[in-house]
Structures are given as structure tokens and as C-alpha cells.
A protein has these predicted regions:
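Residue-level marker for buried hydrophobic side chains located in beta-strands
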Residues: 31-33, 63-66, 103, 149, ...
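Short acidic low-complexity segments
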Residues: 131-142
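Non-catalytic terminal accessory segments
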Residues: 1-9, 247-269
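Acidic, histidine-bearing metal-coordination/catalytic regions of metal-dependent phosphoesterases
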Residues: 1-35, 268
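Core catalytic region of metal-dependent phosphoesterases/phosphodiesterases
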Residues: 17-21, 39-133
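Conserved beta-sheet core of the metallophosphoesterase superfamily
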Residues: 147-149, 154-246, 265
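Active-site glycine-centered loops adjacent to acidic/histidine catalytic or metal-binding residues
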Residues: 36, 68-69, 106, 152, ...
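Beta-strand-turn-beta hairpins that frame and shape the catalytic cleft
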Residues: 20-32, 140-149, 182-187
């Protein structure tokens, strides 16, 4: 039996949306955000993916938001033949009965469909029920009276424009960056670091995001956003920011930066 705890349930409407149902009395959503695992690539880091699950278990986190490129383009040379890459993903992606993944599929993930007619969205929904796909390129997660957008690659999301989501997580960039579009459309955009060894900048490195999202009467209250990097078989925080949403409709969102250490190396010490 598969039991997701605490009350983490979902249903799937017709469009690129899912509803993440929280208890009426639960005012905090804790989740980990990852992106760009590129499974099947020579630069995959399955060890870090396993460490991510262990981190979630140790912290009592039951939700992972995945911003896409879960596999590497099957046209690229890799650890396994292109026709076996989807099976390789199914056999090697971790599983824990208390963890549910919400995934938007990226530009690499569409390659099996183009080459072999393998729709990764259908395959994952049928054979890996803990990996809930919410569409290609962009998807929306409704939670209480709000919504979170997952996007891959970076685009000004039409879903965000329609739903007026205040939070968008982007894959594809392979580095961590916070993008404030508050003066125009008033939402927080976060580029999620990769969970592999494929980098686009010399200052980037693998990592995950730990988020704690607080609600007040069903609406976003504040977001505690932590950037973590791998070290000693786990993850350590290197950056933490808090964003307040209470007056987002009448005032610019307030940011409180707690600590921003400069991390130049992955070496201990």
C-alpha cells in the first residue's frame, strides 16, 4: 500500500494543473524544489537524488516540486542507449511511500516522444504513481486560494498570467537566481539549481531548495526559501531569504535577507 502523509492528496483537472489539497487547519506547506536531474547523462547525480530523498525523510518533508529535464535528451550520448533511457529512469528514480513529486516536463523530456513516440507524461503517470506530471514546459499547482507555477524552460508563463500566481519556479537555467518581477506583474521568480553536474556558469553547482510556505486565511503569508548544496552525503544551507506577501496587491513585496554567504568551493572547510 502507498500512503502519503500527512494529508497530501491531489486530483488532476483537464488542463496543466493539479490541486494539492491541504488540511483546512494546516497553514504551512513544506517542500523541496529540484530541477534538471538529466538522468541517463554521464553527468547525472543519482547519489544526490537519493540524498534529496533522505533529506526529505529526515526533515519530515512529503512534497517535491520538480522543474523538469528529469532525463537527458535521448539524442545525447549517455550511460545507457537512447531506447533504454526511459526504462533506466523508471528503474533508478528513488521511491518512498511518503513522498509525492509534482513534475513539469522540460525540453529534454520531450525527446522520447519525438523519436520513439514514448510520452513520458503518460509513462510516469502509469508506472511511477508517485511522480505526478502536470504537463510539458509549464504547469500549475493550486493550493488553498493560491497557485504555484513550475516552468521549463524559462518563459513568462501564460498560466501565471491567467492565475496571477505570486510564485514561479523555473528549471532550465542550471543556476540559482531569484528574479523579482514585482514592479511589472508582481510575482517572485526563482531559477532552481541543477541536481546534476551540467552547469551553465562557473559559479553554479548542484543543489536543492527547501521552502516553507505559510498561509493566512488561505492566502500566501510568507515564503522561507533556503538554498542548499551537497556536502558529507547530505545538504547544507548556504543562503536563506524570507519573502512576505501580505501586502502584495497594494505594496511591493518585502524581502528580508537573512544570510548570503559566498560559496566558492565544494571542498570541506
Amino acid at each position: 500500500d502507498i500512503i502519503y502523509t500527512p494529508e497530501v492528496r491531489y486530483n488532476v483537472p483537464a488542463s496543466n494543473e493539479v490541486n494539492l489539497l491541504m488540511s483546512q487547519n494546516d497553514e504551512t506547506l513544506r517542500a523541496v524544489v529540484i530541477s534538471d536531474t538529466h538522468i541517463g547523462s554521464e553527468k547525472e547525480r543519482l547519489d544526490l537524488l537519493e540524498d534529496t530523498y533522505n533529506y526529505c525523510i529526515s526533515k519530515g518533508i512529503h512534497v517535491i516540486f520538480n522543474c523538469g529535464d528529469i532525463i537527458d535528451n535521448i539524442s545525447n550520448p549517455g550511460k545507457v542507449d537512447s531506447e533504454d533511457r526511459v526504462n533506466y529512469l523508471l528503474n533508478n528514480y528513488p521511491f518512498d511511500k511518503s513522498i509525492l513529486n509534482f513534475i513539469v516536463l522540460g525540453n529534454h523530456d520531450i525527446s522520447p516522444l519525438k523519436v520513439y513516440g514514448q510520452n513520458l507524461m503518460t509513462i510516469l503517470n502509469n508506472y511511477h504513481h508517485d511522480l505526478v506530471t502536470i504537463g510539458y514546459c509549464e504547469g500549475l499547482i493550486n493550493v488553498k486560494n493560491e497557485a504555484i507555477v513550475l516552468s521549463h524552460p524559462y518563459i513568462d508563463c501564460s498560466l501565471n498570467a491567467n492565475k496571477q500566481s505570486k510564485i514561479v519556479f523555473y528549471g532550465h537555467s542550471h543556476f540559482y537566481k531569484i528574479k523579482n518581477f514585482l514592479s511589472q506583474v508582481r510575482y517572485l521568480g526563482v531559477s532552481v539549481p541543477p541536481l546534476c553536474n551540467i552547469f551553465t556558469r562557473d559559479i553554479s553547482y548542484p543543489g536543492i531548495l527547501d521552502i516553507e510556505l505559510s498561509f493566512d486565511k488561505g492566502c500566501f503569508d510568507y515564503l522561507n526559501l533556503k538554498q542548499l548544496i551537497p556536502m558529507y552525503g547530505s545538504f547544507v544551507p548556504v543562503n536563506e531569504n524570507i519573502y512576505y506577501f501580505r501586502r502584495i496587491h497594494t505594496d511591493k513585496m518585502k524581502e528580508e535577507q537573512i544570510v548570503t554567504p559566498k560559496v566558492r568551493t565544494m571542498s570541506p572547510g
